[in-house]
Amino acid sequence: MSFKKQAAALMAAALCVTGAGCSRSAENSGNTGDTVNTDGTVSDGGSAREFDTELTAMQLTSDIKIGWNLGNTLDATGGSGLTQETSWGNPAVTPELIQAVKDAGFNAIRVPTTWERQIGDDGTISADWMSRVQQIVDYAYDLDMYVILNMHHEEWYQPYADKEEEISAKLSSCWTQIAENFKDYDQHLIFEGMNEPRWKNTDYEWNGGNDEGRTVVNHLNKAFVDAVRATGGNNQYRFLMVCPYAANSACRAGASGRRQAHRFGSRVHTLQLCACTARHG
């Protein structure tokens, strides 16, 4: 759809996070060696940037004023190796670009990233690709911008029940690696589990799906949340974004239950408004 890119950019500025934050639970506090400071921040002996555990989801959302979507770059699907970044015609991302975005008034950036072409036969993500993703994240993070990092044009997580076990294992493996790499980052880094998981090229692609597809998406959301939380460090408290089937605002997203509910939000976009505008000029 020609309006999808605009919708994605608008979505990045409107991080839809629901629920209230809460302090670190006793259940999670005994195994990591992390220190919860008297001001509510978390540190792990100095290597991690302090995570504000007192920050609620609604407070974080309010602090995100306007966001910018770095599209058609790390989410591109052409090229090989690091040339994937420029395979759709955009130049390589530079610190100057991100500085210009901040200077224009943006305080959040979404970094859509396609990992599929960078995963080896053994399931390991290319170290070079991980390093480049981290470098771009750091361009914004070091400017105290919020950064939303996701898995984007992945062909392998179409939510069919007979593929759920295989997809869930791969999703968990990928997010475990990503989360481990970024576990010391504070609340300015947000993970978005999937982008528009759906049955592609079917009658169910964009109409809200069916019970099977929606159920599998919710199970995959749980796998994502559990994988990130299990890596420990600041990922125990990280704000996570899950999406419903096809990221459709008419669907409901699910995750792993009450214990996780205080630090995740639903990422949706509405294309109907764009379609209506296009029809009526």
Residue ranges and their predicted role:
Residues 1-10:
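Bacterial N-terminal signal peptides that target proteins for export
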Residues 18-21:
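C-terminal motif of bacterial Sec signal peptides marking the signal peptidase cleavage site
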Residues 66-70, 109-111, 147-149, 191, ...:
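Hydrophobic faces of well-ordered beta-strands that scaffold small-molecule active sites
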Residues 72-76, 108, 115-119, 153-157, ...:
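Solvent-exposed loop/turn segments at secondary-structure junctions
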Residues 89-108, 119, 123-153, 157-193, ...:
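An active-site-proximal structural segment forming one wall of the substrate-binding cleft
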